[in-house]
Amino acid sequence: MIHLTPYEQRMLDGEFGAAKQVALQKIIDYAQILGATELVPITKAHLCCGSTCEPSDFPDGNLDRPDILAMGYHDWQTKLKCPGLDPAAFNSFNETTYVMDDVHCCDTFQWQWTQQTKEFYENNRQILSDAADRGVMIGSTCAPYLAGWLPVMGEYFVTTESSNVLYSNSILGARGNGGGGNTTFCSAICGRAPKWGLHLPENRHGTHVFHVACDTKDKTDWDLLGAAVGRRLAPNAVPVICGDFERPDLIKLKSFFTALAVTSGCELCLIVGVSPEAQTYEMAMGGHEPAAEFTITNEILQ
């Protein structure tokens, strides 16, 4: 059973409009599947807004068709399975949620250089314009933290980007789980998400320890380190990075988390002395013993 606040119950009853009502019901359904018993307020959302090339959108198998648009507000009935709901019912995202768009399949400006059609480009520009009209900050980036999207420590967020969930959890100390397009979209409308996973303090401690004994001078070193860590992680693991490494800057962290994200399902990585929840090794582990320990050397990176 999901325990709702009085405000959430009013939203579910339709007091704040059909769009929020439907979006919240979808989030409640999602919470029940996850086993969550309550919701958290979402004040930062990062979601897909542009044209898409998802195979599920192309039943005829033709991925070059330019006339399919991705965003849920263009297709409530099929994307969100809400028959009978007028798309016009959705005219804005949640008032207290700062929303920025993710990268998408069509270049925002140089469509000719990427061998895409003008029609596809114009469709993409139209959908981004519609998103902006509904309150989305157009960044078109998979690294929104470089463009002002910065949840603070303890703040709940949703994102469709695997490297962003890592950066926001690990470096900013915010709390979020990687999400799909539809659930993230619904959270951005109703401002709620199921309380589960990395929202919970008991899931935010290290499980696997990585001792760094390799070069960490430049961006490539951190890229390789991220891949090496990711390939050794168990599902749902939280790696702790410790050892004699050079303190990474933002660009090196971006490379590290991108490589870690594509080689694993990791969503939180605690870097001792860098992550706010890992000021010390003991703080990172939270009183737990590691399930496994690894030493990453230059030989491994080669």
Regions found by a protein language model. Name each.
Residues 1-302:
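Non-transmembrane, aqueous-exposed alpha-helical and coiled segments at domain scale
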